[in-house]
Curated annotation (Swiss-Prot):
Pfam families: Herpes_UL42. It comes from the Viruses. One of its GO terms (biological process) is DNA replication. It comes from Human herpesvirus 2 (strain HG52). This is DNA polymerase processivity factor. Residues 1-26, 329-434, 446-470 are annotated as: Disordered. Transmembrane segments: none annotated. The lineage of its organism: Viruses, Duplodnaviria, Heunggongvirae, Peploviricota, Herviviricetes. Residues 1-13 have a biased composition (Low complexity). A motif (Bipartite nuclear localization signal) lies at residues 385-404. Plays an essential role in viral DNA replication by acting as the polymerase accessory subunit. Associates with the viral polymerase to increase its processivity and forms high-affinity direct interactions with DNA. Facilitates the origin-binding protein loading onto DNA thus increasing its ability to assemble into a functional complex capable of unwinding duplex DNA. It is found in: Host nucleus.
Length: 470
């Protein structure tokens, strides 16, 4: 039995799943994937913003579609292409994996680059042979001067199937997700990408306020539940009313919609590659999906529009505060740090310099809705002083500055409880709920393979991150 990352064991093939000697000598039926007409134009639009970012990728092909997997600046990137997006999609046999790069200059995905073939008419992928030694052949047609389709034989590419591969895919429903427009996501990404002000905190407070802040910048939005007719929170109504005073357009720019916005949280991301990755992918508007209850919490950014590309960024496990679960793992021993006047920085990216409606008129010793103000879960370093709103953050003493080399010691993380304690006794044996990773894999030497197109280590089968994956 093969052991994969995370301590999970790959389930071996059953005797019924192992092909007989006669079956091994016979080829699988030819698999054919065709793009032409409106479907071809749709795929070209999906790849247009990606440019050359995904040319060197792993293509996982199955009966549900094609998954393009890559790593940009060390972060995992996924682009799912559902079988319904193709003009013809016929697949038989187990899931296959192909490296898209053919040589130093050409790739299976080069055909989808903008202006690569101005008169592109048809793209056809044919997979023949016996698994795991199948061959993929890509053929393309363009429009000739007389209007007829002509095949470019010199552009035909051939690729062999990978005999051994493993791809881990995050899966499950997000605990909280927020939908942001292009200007809203740009503000968030600019705040996260400040190299001199990391780490950055993502926080959803009980007052209905979603904030992204670090030592230099703060971006704040009013979070509302998707499809909610009216909010039951008085603080959300006050905040929304205050925003509407500046006009409906300003109110819309300051409001984000999502699901499970009642689940307050405070998480920290210490990696500044988010801005670089999303700029490389040319992501405009997108959805922030927070997976907070996993052993390794993460945030997934999924682009809106024709290219539903997603990038996954890991969060610091010891800096996750979840009030709605009644616990704060690791060093987060206090309640949620959602009081903006004390937890958030003072130098804001927002154009308005007025205090937010949730803070206006609040007593110094009381929090929102008359509750006693709790200390921030992640207090500032002792060497930092705050001045009047809009002032810079000034170090109190040079001796307290962080050295140029090395990083401050992270708080000790509490030991994670066993799977049986969190998800039930069946979870530790591969059943139950709570699974966060699905896997495609095949090991040629041991004969182990994923028993189905989508295999999960723990929990029921779910579309990873809502993707329609193979």
């Amino acid at each position: 039995m093969a052991h994969l990352p995370g301590g999970a064991a790959a389930a071996p093939l059953s005797e019924d799943a192992i092909p007989s000697p006669r079956e091994r000598t016979e080829d699988w039926p030819p698999c054919q994937i065709v793009l032409q007409g409106a479907e071809l134009n749709g795929i070209l639009q999906a790849f247009a913003p990606l440019r050359t970012s995904l040319l060197d990728s792993l293509l996982v092909v199955g009966d549900r579609g094609i998954l393009v997997h890559n790593a940009i600046f060390g972060e995992q990137v996924f682009l799912p292409l559902d079988h319904s997006q193709f003009s013809r999609y016929r697949w038989g046999g187990p899931t296959a994996a192909f490296l898209s790069l053919v040589d130093q200059k050409r790739s299976l995905l080069s055909v989808f680059r903008a202006n690569q073939y101005p008169d592109l008419r048809r793209v056809e992928l044919t997979v023949t042979g016996q698994a795991p030694f199948r061959t993929l052949v890509q053929r393309i047609w363009t429009t000739a001067s007389d209007g007829e389709a002509v095949e470019l034989a010199s552009e035909t590419l051939m690729k062999r199937e990978l005999t051994s591969f493993a791809v881990l895919l995050p899966q499950g429903d997000p605990d909280v997700q927020l939908r942001l427009t292009k200007p809203q996501l740009t503000k968030v990404v600019n705040a996260v990408g400040d190299e001199t002000a990391k780490p950055t905190t993502f926080e959803l407070g009980p007052n209905g306020k979603f904030s992204v802040f670090n030592a230099r910048t703060c971006v704040t939005f009013a979070a509302r539940e998707e499809g909610a007719s009216s909010s039951t929170s008085a603080q959300v109504q006050i905040l929304t009313s205050a925003l509407k005073k500046a006009g409906q357009a300003a109110a819309n720019a300051k409001t984000v919609y999502g699901e499970n916005t009642h689940r307050t949280f405070s998480v920290v991301v210490d990696d500044c590659s988010m801005r670089a990755v999303l700029r490389r992918l040319q992501v405009g508007g997108g959805t922030l999906k927070f997976f907070l209850t996993a052993d390794v919490p993460s945030v997934c950014v999924t682009a809106t529009g024709p290219n539903a590309v997603s990038a996954v960024f890991l969060l610091k496990p010891q800096r996750v505060c979840l009030n709605w679960l009644g616990r704060s793992p690791g060093s987060s021993t206090g309640s949620l740090a959602s009081q903006d006047s004390r937890a958030g920085p003072t130098d804001s990216q927002d154009s308005s310099s007025e205090p937010d409606a949730g803070d206006r008129g609040a007593p110094e010793e009381e929090g929102l809705e008359g509750q006693a103000r709790v200390p921030p879960a992640f207090p500032e370093p002792p060497g930092t002083k705050r001045r009047h709103p809009g002032a810079e953050v000034v170090p109190a003493d040079d001796a307290t500055k962080r050295p140029k080399t090395g990083v401050p010691a992270a708080p000790t993380r509490a030991e994670s409880p066993p799977l049986s304690a969190r998800y039930g006794p069946e979870a530790a044996e591969g059943g139950g709920d709570g699974g966060r990773y699905a896997c495609y894999f095949r090991d040629l030497q041991t004969g182990d393979a994923s028993p189905s197109p989508l295999s999960a280590f723990r929990g029921p089968q779910r579309p990873p991150y809502g993707f329609g994956l193979p």
